[in-house]
Amino acid sequence: TGDGEDVGYPGNDQSPWVFERKWEIDSLCYPIRLAYHYWKEVGDTSVFDSKWEQAMEAVYRTFREQQRKDSLGPYRFSRVTDRQGDTLLNDGWGSPVNPVGLIVSSFRPSDDATLFGFLVPSNLFAITSLRQVAEILRAVRNNTDLAGRCEALAGEVEEAVKKYAIVEHPEFGKVYAFEVDGYGSRVFMDDANAVSYTHLRAHETKA
């Protein structure tokens, strides 16, 4: 269930438009994917107004914030529940991560809490989405500043994936972990919901 039972930032004053405040990277990627392909298929640029531009600035800012380089950021989530996967440990901050350039996703697309905060398929999705945003910003809004920042962030996350998410499996050799923490911990699995490794091709996302 959602409204009224959660504690932590931003308190219990959540908007009626928000069912629950589980932070997932893909929640910001899907609107970008929809807008990008609408533009490519229809050619309509009227949707990319100043409000859209402000929203993309917020997406960029949120991704940067959730790299957790300077602090944990304002987001935390705690819920009274008998399911471990329905809340975050560590007083709502989730498992500790090493700020190596990857983006924290507190929850998976399945709504289960991540075991380790760096959910790799979602980071790969973010790379694709940031580059799609940059393409629109350059072609439609002539906003080279935000476009450049999005491209730089995509490149940083991509390099961090290569360095920290490709690990040695005792049986299969070098593989992508599903989640990592930047300290060396990793989990090998895939999740049923999209985006996951099974769905990457459908999301124009490369591993």
Residue ranges and their predicted role:
Residues 1-85:
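Aromatic-rich carbohydrate-recognition surfaces in CAZymes
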Residues 146-184:
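Acidic, glycine-rich loop-and-beta core segments that form the ion-binding/anion-interacting portion
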Residues 38-51, 113, 133-149:
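Inter-helical turn/loop segments and adjacent helix faces that build the functional surface
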Residues 2-10, 96-108:
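Active-site-adjacent bridging/hinge elements
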Residues 1-3, 80-99, 162-169:
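An acidic intrinsically disordered interaction segment
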Residues 198-207:
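Conserved small/polar residues in nucleotide/adenosyl-binding loops
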Residues 13-26, 109-123, 179-197:
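Solvent-exposed loop and edge beta-strand segments that line ligand/cofactor-binding
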Residues 121-134:
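A conserved active-site cap/scaffold subdomain adjacent to cofactor or substrate pockets
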